[in-house]
Amino acid sequence: MYLEQLSLTDFRSYQQADLGLEPGVNVFIGSNGLGKTNLVEALGYLASLSSHRVSQDGPLIRFGAEQALIRGNLVRGTQRLGLEVEINASRANRARINRANPVRAREILGLCRTVLFAPEDLSLVKGDPGNRRRFLDDLLQSLHPRFAGLRADYERVLKQRNALLKSARGHSRSRQAPSADFLSTIEVWDQHFANHAAQLLSARLKVLEQLKPEMSRAYQELTDGSKELSARYRSSLDGYQEDSDDAAEIHDDEAASLVSASVESLTEHYLLALAAVRQREIERGLTLIGPHRDEVELGLGQAPARGYASHGETWSVALALRLASYYVLKADQEIDGADPILVLDDVFAELDSSRRSKLAHMVAGAEQVLVTAAVDDDVPAELSGRRIRVSAIGVVDD
C-alpha cells in the first residue's frame, strides 16, 4: 500500500498543508523544528489513532484551533480509499471513509498500515515494560483492528475492579472482614476481568510467536551475527505463589506452556490466581495480576538486552523489533496490499555507517518509504528517491 496524498488542517505547526506522495522512497529534508516530523506523525495518526511523540491528542491541534484534520488518499492493492480523521479538543474524535457520514474514529483502524522507526524506539529496549507491551498491542491492532476494542474493554474493567478494591481497602485497614456485598460484587468483576485478560494474553502470546523468528533474522542481518536476539513473554500468571493446591498446580504445570493454552483455560487460570491473591489486592487497593503487569523480556546472547546491551546493540535490537513487525504485517494474507508504509523519522542520524547501510538495504524494496532527515548526508545512498524540502516557507519538491 502507499499514500498518494496527505492533507493537514490545523495539525501541529501546519495551518494548511497539501502534499502529493509517490510509491517508493520519499525523503523530507529540513532543519529541526520546521515540521518534517509533523508530516509523518500525521500519517502515523491516520494509521493508528496515536502519536509516537505524545500520549494525549491536545498537542496535535494547532495552538488556538478547536480541531485538527488529517486527510489521506490511500492506494491499497486494487482499492483506493479516502481516509479522514478529525481530532477534537472538546468532543470525541471522528473519522470518515470515502467521504461518507462520520463514524467512530476507531472504524478506520487497520485500513492504513505503517511501521515507524524513530529515536524513541530505544525505549523498546531500555524503557519500562509498558513500552514493550504497547509494541505488541500496536502490532495486534494493525493486524486485527477489533483488538483495539478488546484492549479498551480490558482497561475499563481493570479501572472498575481497582476502584472496588480501593473501596475495600478502608475496611481492611480497620480490620473489618470484607462484606458479603463486596465478595459477591468482586466475583462478578473477577469473571469479567478474567475473560478479557485471557483474550488479551492469548493474542499477545500468538503475535510474539510470529515475531520471534523475524526478530532473530532481522538482528542477524543488521549485525555480524555474533549474538542471538531472543524474546520471552513473562506473564504475571507465571510467578504468583500461594499455598493453595490449585495455585501450585497452575504455577508448576500449565503456566510454562501458556502459548498453547486455550482462552477458556487461561480464564480459569486467572480466576484461580485472583482468588489466591485477593487479600493482598485488598491491602494494596489494586489488581496485582493481569496483562497490564506482564513483561516481554528481550535477550541478547546469554544476557538481558535491557541494562547489558551497548548503545549500538540497543539500536540494533530496536530496529530488529520494528523490522520484524514489518515482516509480520507484510506476510498477512487477510487483506489485499498488506505491505505497510515504512516511516523512518530522523533515524539515520543516530546510526553508525554500517547500520545505516544495512537498514537502508533492508527497507529499500518496500512499496513506500518515507524518510525524514536534517541534511542530505544523513540519508544513505541506497535510499535514492524523491527529495522534498521542508522550510519555514513551506514544503516543496527539489
Swiss-Prot record:
Gene Ontology molecular-function annotations: ATP binding; single-stranded DNA binding
Q: Look up the record and report any one GO term of the cellular component aspect.
A: cytoplasm
Mostly located where? cytoplasm
Keyword ATP-binding on this protein? yes
The protein's superkingdom reads Bacteria
DNA repair as a keyword? yes
Q: Which GO terms describe its biological process?
A: DNA replication; DNA synthesis involved in DNA repair; double-strand break repair; SOS response
Where, per UniProt, does this protein localize?
Cytoplasm
InterPro entries, alphabetically?
DNA-binding_RecF (IPR001238), DNA-binding_RecF_CS (IPR018078), P-loop_NTPase (IPR027417), RecF/RecN/SMC_N (IPR003395), RecF_2 (IPR042174)
Residues bound to ATP: 30-37
Signal sequence annotation: none
Which keywords accompany this UniProt record? Answer: ATP-binding, Cytoplasm, DNA damage, DNA repair, DNA replication, DNA-binding, Nucleotide-binding, SOS response
Give the similarity note.
Answer: Belongs to the RecF family.
Output the PANTHER family linked to this UniProt entry.
DNA REPLICATION AND REPAIR PROTEIN RECF (PTHR32182:SF0)
Provide the function of this protein: The RecF protein is involved in DNA metabolism; it is required for DNA replication and normal SOS inducibility. RecF binds preferentially to single-stranded, linear DNA. It also seems to bind ATP.
Name used for this protein in its record:
DNA replication and repair protein RecF
| Taxonomic lineage from the root | Bacteria, Bacillati, Actinomycetota, Actinomycetes, Micrococcales
